[in-house]
Amino acid sequence: MIVIPKLPLGNFASILRVIDKCGGYAELITSPILLRKADKIILAGVGAFDYGMTSINSMWREELENAVLVRRIPILGICLGMQLMCKSSEEGHLPGLGWIDAKVRRFSWSSNLNLKLPHMGWNTVKIVKSNPLLEIGNDEQRFYFVHSYHVVCNNPRDVLATAHYGYDFTAAINHENIFGVQFHPEKSHRFGIQLVSNFLRL
């Protein structure tokens, strides 16, 4: 069963629709105990880092870590969900889940670039490491982004793909059974549908 914890910071309807298009079925759960039945987990979210971690710490963390770290259930973090998997964020004060050896940093450039935050819209994603999650037919794919912070991995082997906005940043990560994407596959049409299909087959 694919489960999606119903944190108070996600666009779950769009994700459920994409999973349905892929021929899968996902259950939006409000009880952490239902994570014990999961064979795939999607951690989705938008918003502030500390708010997300407060939501997880309040009721989800123990069962999430049992599923992901002990039972090794594949998990896909989307946008804030990916950032919460890291050790910390410049956006907040609370520690993250720490599953990925990485920190989350705010975009910062010289003023002459005249770039705006959030980084919003379509961007090309370049695959830097082969992985079944991103087997979509070519090395450069386009996905939809909405974010002001990005993940900086301490271990380059955890980086699956990058994108460019002023400079190259991490667009997708993987460490063992843990996957994350900074973009929104549920808003990324055929590329997003293929990525979700790939995750369901892992």
Show where each model-derived region lies.
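Histidine-centered divalent metal-coordination motifs
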Residues: 79, 147, 184
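Active-site-proximal beta-strand elements of phosphoester/diester hydrolases
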Residues: 3-6, 144, 179-183
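Pocket-forming structural segment of enzyme catalytic cores
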Residues: 88-165
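C-terminal and late-domain segments of enzyme folds
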Residues: 150-202
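A residue-level structural signature of the nucleotidyltransferase/glycosyltransferase Rossmann-like core
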Residues: 74-77, 96-97, 117, 142-143, ...
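N-terminal beta1-alpha1 cap of cysteine-dependent amidohydrolase-like domains
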Residues: 1-74, 103-108, 191-202
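Catalytic nucleophile loop
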Residues: 41-44, 68-89, 97
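A short secondary-structure junction motif
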Residues: 48-51, 83-93, 183-185
